[in-house]
Amino acid sequence: MSTSITLEGFYRKAGMLIPWFMSAALVLFIVGVYLGFFVCPIEARQGNSYRIIFIHIPAAWLAMSLYLLMAVASIVGLLKNSRLAFILAQAMAPTGALMGFIALFSGAFWGRPTWGTYWVW
């Protein structure tokens, strides 16, 4: 009895789950944006510029998490000689790069009103 997942089986199961995950992500995104930008009070020292943090921190965490998962998937792919692990690692790369880009520039846009400069390092 084999416990490995074939590519065809993975694509079939992933295809069935995509609409559910996309719906949940959209609902959570809308709720998060509403709470972060309209419900939270104005911060005493930073004013409204602190609201950028509601985009910056999740993007940075997601980028780091995706890069860690890419490394794990690549190691699994090397150890188990699994094409699926390499496909998963390759699929995570564009999203990790996008989240890294968002984190980098949202941090700069937060730094400008907070520190008076886009970059401190």
Regions found by a protein language model. Give the residues of each.
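Hydrophobic cores of alpha-helical transmembrane segments in multi-pass integral membrane proteins
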Residues: 2-10, 15-43, 47-121
